């Protein structure tokens, strides 16, 4: 038996599907029927006469109460793959639309996509119903892209002002020479499809477009992308761009990398691409962890590229000219004497008087006045994470025999591992040869081979990497050391699985690379030395 509610719903549906003329005539006949009062014979006759030419109509309206949470169209109508369009997907439309001018062939394409987001995505870079076009890119590299004013205005306040504001101009074509086509397409894809598609080679241009057209969520995504891909190779360029885009968080992240990995950053190709203002900021930096001769050589490399940018001959005079007052930000008097004598003094950039005065600064009791900053940079103070609560030694251990001691660790903030603190001999002074290594998922990130002397105490002795290694948060890295020495060594006890070092939390776990007995509870590699 059909449920009453279901019957009423079917009646309501049937009524709504009737033509308006039928509905109106039906309602009039109903009024006539009710005029006669409570069910007299004349009323019945009138009703029968009135409806003789029309089918009986059921238009009872019931009240629908929705107590449950409102569902979206996709929840009510789960997406099904049409039998006659097996290859038609939103992803394929996105791929097709990257090449522009794609009209939808199916007359009922709207029915293929249950959500407004999916239907909107079909319009991305599509000439169908487009009411504006953009000519994007510099002369000689332009691309004509279609747009839909309503969609663009919903996604950007700048587009809203352009198309619907008080000063809106009714233009069918808008030229945008200062934005790259790929970046503009990435912004359109976000506005139309609610998808963020970023690439390393276009993310800066996309950030510029997002800033220009005030699309804040896309801009934030670009900044996050840049932060996660930040390294010594691109830190200087990103520093310059972050200042231009007024992104203080990204600027701070760049400085952290540049300070800790200063020599790598200064030797990178990107350093030569920075503007003069950024160059001054870096040369003025108090916390650079770099030898001053490296800073000097980096400045000369920048000057050479700057001469090319200004179409100047590559002469010593022009290099000094483009450096200008920034030359005096290099702390030449703080170099090691050998570095100065064999490097800066013979570069030709310094005048004869400057060279003589700096030599006197090194050797004379009465030092001359210099235009150069003569105070050494402070650099960064390394932090030490000690993972053992005590150490000990016994008559039959710890021996090495060329075996690997290894431990895995993870941090909750980005840090830069500068080296390890290692134990020394428990039998008096001794020399050790140490090969230290840092890996992530089997890939070697840093290694070094060096020697160190121990004095017989239970202290730890630092062994450094050539350059600090950047460590990303929430990922386990493997620290390994192979020691070679004849004497017995101290070893750690009462190891901790988690250690708090300032604002950084370090977690430890055993490593399968360890073949000499080191683990979380005891063994070697008692300290991680890092910058944070």
From Swiss-Prot:
One of its GO terms (biological process) is cerebral cortex development. Signal peptide: none annotated. It is found in: Cytoplasm, Cytosol; Nucleus. Keywords: Cytoplasm, Neurogenesis, Nucleus. Residues 130-200 form the BTB domain. CDD domains: BACK_BTBD3 (cd18524), BTB_POZ_BTBD3 (cd18348). PROSITE patterns: BTB. One of its GO terms (cellular component) is nucleus. Residues 245-310 form the BACK domain. Residues 43-53 have a biased composition (Low complexity). InterPro entries: BACK (IPR011705), BTB/POZ_dom (IPR000210), PHR (IPR012983), PHR_sf (IPR038648), SKP1/BTB/POZ_sf (IPR011333). Residues 23-54 are annotated as: Disordered. It holds the Pfam family BTB. Expressed in visual cortex. Expressed in visual cortex layer IV neurons. Acts as a key regulator of dendritic field orientation during development of sensory cortex. Also directs dendrites toward active axon terminals when ectopically expressed. This is BTB/POZ domain-containing protein 3. It comes from Mustela putorius furo (European domestic ferret). The gene is BTBD3.
């Amino acid at each position: 038996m059909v449920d009453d509610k279901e019957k009423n719903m079917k009646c309501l549906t049937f009524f709504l599907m009737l033509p308006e003329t039928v509905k109106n005539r039906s309602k009039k006949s109903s009024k006539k029927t009710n005029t006669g009062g409570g069910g007299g014979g004349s009323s019945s006759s009138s009703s029968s006469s009135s409806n003789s030419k029309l089918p009986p109509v059921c238009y009872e309206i019931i009240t629908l109460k929705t107590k449950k949470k409102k569902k979206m169209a996709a929840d009510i109508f789960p997406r099904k793959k049409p039998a006659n369009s097996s290859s038609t997907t939103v992803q394929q439309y996105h791929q097709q639309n990257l090449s522009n001018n794609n009209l939808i062939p199916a007359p009922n394409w709207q029915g293929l996509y249950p959500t407004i987001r999916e239907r909107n995505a079909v319009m991305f870079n599509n000439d169908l119903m487009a009411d504006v076009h953009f000519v994007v890119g510099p002369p000689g590299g332009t691309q004509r892209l279609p747009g839909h004013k309503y969609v663009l205005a919903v996604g950007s306040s700048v587009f809203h002002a352009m198309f619907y504001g008080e000063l809106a101009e009714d233009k069918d074509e808008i030229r945008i020479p200062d934005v790259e086509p790929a970046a503009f397409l990435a912004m359109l894809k976000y506005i139309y499809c609610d998808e963020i598609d970023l690439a390393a080679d276009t993310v800066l241009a996309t950030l510029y477009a997002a800033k220009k057209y005030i699309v804040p969520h896309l801009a934030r995504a670009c900044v996050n992308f840049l932060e996660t891909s930040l390294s010594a190779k691109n830190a200087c360029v990103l520093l310059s761009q972050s200042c231009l885009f007024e992104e203080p968080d990204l600027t701070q992240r760049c400085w952290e990398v540049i300070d800790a990995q200063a020599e790598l950053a200064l030797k990178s190709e990107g350093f030569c691409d920075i503007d003069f203002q950024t160059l001054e900021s870096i040369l003025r930096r108090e916390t650079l962890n770099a030898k001053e001769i490296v800073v000097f050589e980096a400045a000369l490399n920048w000057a050479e590229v700057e001469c090319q940018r200004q179409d100047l001959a590559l002469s010593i005079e022009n290099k000094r000219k483009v450096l200008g007052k920034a030359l005096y930000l290099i702390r030449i008097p703080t170099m090691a004497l050998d570095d100065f004598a064999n490097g800066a003094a013979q570069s030709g950039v310094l005048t004869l008087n400057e060279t003589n005065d700096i030599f006197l600064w090194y050797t004379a009791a009465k030092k001359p006045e210099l235009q150069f900053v003569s105070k050494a940079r402070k650099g960064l103070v390394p932090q030490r994470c000690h993972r053992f609560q005590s150490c000990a030694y016994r008559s039959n251990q710890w021996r090495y025999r060329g075996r690997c001691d290894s431990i895995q660790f993870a941090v909750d903030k980005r840090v830069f591992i500068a080296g390890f603190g290692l134990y020394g001999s428990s039998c008096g002074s001794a020399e050790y040869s140490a090969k230290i290594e840092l890996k992530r998922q089997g890939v070697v990130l840093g290694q070094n081979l060096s020697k160190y002397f121990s004095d017989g105490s239970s202290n730890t002795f630092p062994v450094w990497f050539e350059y600090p290694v950047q460590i990303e948060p929430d990922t386990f890295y493997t620290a390994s050391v192979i020691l070679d020495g004849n004497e017995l060594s101290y070893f750690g006890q009462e190891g901790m699985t988690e250690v708090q070092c300032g604002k950084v939390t370090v977690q430890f776990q055993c490593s399968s690379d360890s073949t000499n007995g080191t683990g979380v509870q005891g063994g070697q590699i008692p300290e991680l030395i890092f910058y944070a």
